[in-house]
């Protein structure tokens, strides 16, 4: 049986048949199909970093077009003119906390479009 024939035979197996094959190989060769602990720990840490779902949107710098940034801040946060101006003038300031990833990315894009520098934390 060639390597390609073996791979094709494995592709045609059901999940139960594959499970039985793995167990038979473990018994026959005295090995384990389980991943080493060190590798599993690293994979878990990477997964945890990627799973962050809430972000703080921070205005790091208003840039040169402060009026446009103030308008964008008002639109995105619902703040009044005075409050939005205070945030923009006092940068770096947190605009919103605990924002979903998609909403945070949208806010960042809109504010960067008008010249602001935004950080997601």
UniProtKB/Swiss-Prot annotation:
GO terms for cellular component: cytosolic large ribosomal subunit. InterPro entries: Ribosomal_bL12, Ribosomal_bL12_C, Ribosomal_bL12_C/ClpS-like, Ribosomal_bL12_oligo, Ribosomal_bL12_oligo_N_sf. Keywords: Ribonucleoprotein, Ribosomal protein. The keyword Ribosomal protein applies. The keyword Ribosomal protein applies. GO terms for molecular function: mRNA binding; structural constituent of ribosome. Pfam families: Ribosomal_L12 (PF00542), Ribosomal_L12_N (PF16320). GO terms for biological process: translation. CDD domains: Ribosomal_L7_L12. PANTHER family: 39S RIBOSOMAL PROTEIN L12, LARGE RIBOSOMAL SUBUNIT PROTEIN BL12M. Belongs to the bacterial ribosomal protein bL12 family. Homodimer. Part of the ribosomal stalk of the 50S ribosomal subunit. Forms a multimeric L10(L12)X complex, where L10 forms an elongated spine to which 2 to 4 L12 dimers bind in a sequential fashion. Binds GTP-bound translation factors. Forms part of the ribosomal stalk which helps the ribosome interact with GTP-bound translation factors. Is thus essential for accurate translation. This is Large ribosomal subunit protein bL12. It comes from Clostridium novyi (strain NT). The gene is rplL.
